[in-house]
């Protein structure tokens, strides 16, 4: 395994690289990570983030073991690419760095149902609890759904439409205990581009090994490559490992609109960050270590915390810790006991947090709903390195990746990935951007 510290004579790889060890492609003469003309240009449109991908590149099953997937390493300063396997990841981290994970757990939330009056088949994707006996779901087909429509769920149970909540979602009154029913009869919500039904293997494959809190309707896929051995190697190198929570919501299935990126929004998603996580991240930054974010959901959580710490106005709604739960808390089944609420009474709107002292603001624990949408140009305040997958063209997660590495570098990397046979999307290969 290549040791990145030894490869550069023990020097900080962010400042100097031994180009003689660069086994990949150099994509250009630009050595200044902050000098990316394409990121400073205004008027970017969704079409600027398009690329062609033949169906054969889409991974429909994961590799075994998890860390046998390929790892493309992008160096922003050198504008270069290297090729490894994911098992090599720990060699890129040093003592004093930290890794931040998203420990949300994917629910087996895709259920089949029948309309008793017609016998018509309906597929439901339950995305979040909205209160006692109430869940919000995407419905297919949903054109004829209306208030009072009753569905009989396969395996027992029922779901009755309470109201339409958006163009594609409905609020249902469900029979309890619904979580137990979903665990027994639900399917894992693997993406439709896999062009197959979920099976028993997806119960493990479409879940990170560290998943803890149920609430997501899609996996934080950057974490799927990690194994217990990966964490053992990281800890042996003196790397601290902490977690945030962000439940991936139905907005992950909603494409961005064609045309200008500016002015578009993401649906709110629930997140939490504990005091321990904030302390480790603050300590890492304070001593000059690097913060490695595992995935775009982790990145959005950390950057939301940075906005709050800096007193910036952000699209954020705080969770309320009230006896018996609140509408916000009930949506996700409550929050972490050691998190604090932000934004006073928890009403929808703008939240602020002013950090004490001078210099870079310190992150503080929070829980609530974030609409953080990151696209070029963007000044990252917390994240120094990003672990992510290869994403759909023009998706919000691809835009975040382009904001972090530069649009031209990412598009070049995707072409290099196709040329060298990488596997794309949720069950595909991985990318490390340093």
Sequence positions of predicted segments:
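Surface-exposed, charge/polar-rich loops and edge strands
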Residues: 2-6, 34-434
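Intrinsically disordered, low-complexity proline-rich tandem-repeat tracts
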Residues: 15, 25, 29-35
